[in-house]
Each structure stands twice: as C-alpha cells, then as structure tokens.
A protein has these predicted regions:
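Rossmann-like NAD(P)-binding element
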Residues: 54-84
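Interdomain hinge/lid region at the active-site interface
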Residues: 199-275
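C-terminal non-catalytic accessory extensions
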Residues: 255-303
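Active-site-proximal catalytic alpha-helix in oxidoreductases
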Residues: 132, 167-218
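NAD(P)+-binding Rossmann beta1-loop-alpha1 motif at the extreme N-terminus of oxidoreductases
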Residues: 1-57
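Rossmann-fold dinucleotide-binding core
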Residues: 99-164, 168-171
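Hydrophobic Val/Ile/Leu positions in short beta-strands of Rossmann-like dinucleotide-binding domains
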Residues: 9-10, 69, 136
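ADP-ribose/adenylate-binding Rossmann-like module
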Residues: 86-103
C-alpha cells in the first residue's frame, strides 16, 4: 500500500487482523493495533473499545489514513456510527466481515461516498496470503482502495472482485453449504455410533470427510456460527442441502432415478469437472495407507 499515513487495525489481535497487520507492516506502513486484548506495554498496540473510544483511540482514528475493521459483525455495526463521526472523509475503511450486504447498507447510511472496501480471505489465516483467494467488494471506490487491492495481489493473494450481493451468494455456497454438509456428516456419524475401527478401514472419501470435520470442529465456534447465522442466503443453502438428502433418499428406490440424480449432481460441477476429478486423484494419492494409524500417533503424542 503506497498511500502514506497511519493505519489502525481494529481487532488486530485476532487471526485476520494479525494477518493484515503483518502484511501492512511488511509494506512499510505504521500500524496501530487496537484490541480489547492488546498488551498496552507493547509498542504499536492500544487496548481500547472501538465502540466507545477513549481520547487516545479517538486521536488515532482522527489521524488515520486507513482503518481496518477485523472485528465481528456485531461490533462493526455498533462501531460504524462512531467511526463516521471520528474518521476524516478521505480515510479508507476496510472491513473483513464474512457477510457483505448488511455492512454495505450501513456504510451507505453512515459514510455515504467515503472510501470503503470489503475483503474476505477465503481461508484460515494461519495458511498465509500467497496463493490464497480473497474476495473483495468496492463499497465506495477510491484510489486508496485500488492501492489496497494491488497490495493484496503483491503479497500473492488471488483477488476476486464481486458486488456485495454476489459475495453473499458465493459464500452461501462455498462456506454455508460446505460447512453445513460437513457438520451434518459428523452429526450423522455420531448417531450411527460406528465401531472405532471404521477410521482404519475407510475409503478415501470418508477419510477426507473426517479430516474436514476435524478441521471445522477444531475451529472457533463464533466464526462458523456467524457464517451460518448472518448470510442472507444461509437458510436457502441449508434448505437446499436438506432437500437434496430427501431427493437422494427417494432416488434409492429405482436405478434410473439414482442414475438421474448422479447426472444432476455431476452437472453442478460444470466445466470444472475434469479439473476437480484430477484434484481428487492427487489428493487421494497423498493420503496415508492407514489413516487410523495417523490418528493413533496423534493421540499418543498428546498423552
């Protein structure tokens, strides 16, 4: 980011905030991390409440050229009226919320015409930016927003630009639906109460689903809850999943019906089917021959 001036990263002690703080400092920017969990004895950190700023935070916001909102949607919504009062009109506001249509409307209300950019890293922050997809929404475009997007690309991110509505429709499929399907698999597995040896004899699809289940259930409940709760298309996505299971159940009565269901599912991949099949083959080739043994070694290492 070439624009000069102080950067304030609200929520900089969280995973996304920390990721962006590192990237901004690597680009030579002076970054102030603002977070209720910040260590006030550490340079460049301020312990403060964004929704009720003290004198120090109010001064920092008033001097900021860029403010990053790496906070939950509830806090971001409560902070917007405060930011509208304290931020200079030229300050670029970058929000990292997982749902964009509500914040887009709020920005139009509280900072109409002021520079604002939405970003959504579509990966766990511990994986790093290089080679990872980032969705962006230009709420109110400005040269500073161009520079921020260019900086993301310079750090190796694959930037995909969308509108706020397109963003939420995309994430309803790739996050809401995906997470719901994996969690439903885990709940069904628990209900079946299968013998523990199942993990050691499982075929690759089951092994991969177990790995995905471990990844999600080992994460932060608030993050996954926000995705399922706040996306305006979340109910539609979960309903589509439930209806698909009902369609599958009905199609098991006759082979032609089941074949038609397979064709319909295949159609959802579109032109990306060959690439997806190749990716699956590569993924399966990397799996251990005895995935249950991997679990056993991990369990022994924790004891």
């Amino acid at each position: 980011v070439t624009t000069t001036g102080r950067v304030v990263v609200a929520g900089g002690c969280g995973a996304v905030g920390a990721l962006l703080t590192v990237a901004l400092r690597a680009a030579g920017r002076e970054v102030l991390v603002v977070d209720p969990a910040a260590d006030p004895t550490t340079p460049g950190m301020l312990r403060a409440d964004l929704t009720a700023p003290d004198t120090a935070l109010a001064g920092a916001l008033g001097d900021a050229a860029l403010v990053v909102l790496a906070v939950p949607d509830v806090i971001a919504g409560a902070a917007l009226p405060v930011l509208a009062r304290l931020l200079p009109p030229h300050t670029l506001l970058v929000e990292t919320l997982s749902v964009k249509t509500p914040i887009a409307a709020a920005l139009h209300t509280y900072r109409p015409g002021a520079p604002a950019l939405g970003i959504n890293p579509m990966f766990a922050p511990d994986l790093g930016l290089p080679g990872r997809p980032v969705l962006t929404v230009r709420h109110h475009d400005a040269p500073a927003a161009d520079e921020f997007v260019t900086a993301l690309r310079a750090r190796g991110a694959t930037v995909v630009e969308t509108t706020a509505d397109e963003h939420d429709r995309i994430t309803a499929a790739v996050q809401v639906l995906t997470h719901a399907a994996i969690l439903a698999f885990g709940i069904a597995l628990d209900r079946l109460d299968v013998p523990g040896v199942a993990a050691r004899v499982a075929a690759p699809p089951h092994t991969v689903l177990r790995a995905l289940l471990a990844r999600i259930t080992g994460g932060t409940a608030e993050v996954y809850h926000d995705i399922q709760r706040t996306n305006p298309y979340a109910d539609t996505a979960r309903r589509a999943l439930a209806e698909a299971v009902a369609d599958l159940d009905a199609a098991t009565d006759a082979l032609p019906d089941f074949a038609a269901l397979l064709d319909r599912a295949h159609t959802a991949l579109g032109d990306g089917c060959p690439a997806a099949a190749e990716l699956c083959a590569q993924l399966f080739a990397t799996l251990p021959r005895d995935p249950g043994a991997v679990s056993s070694r991990e369990e022994r290492s924790r004891t």
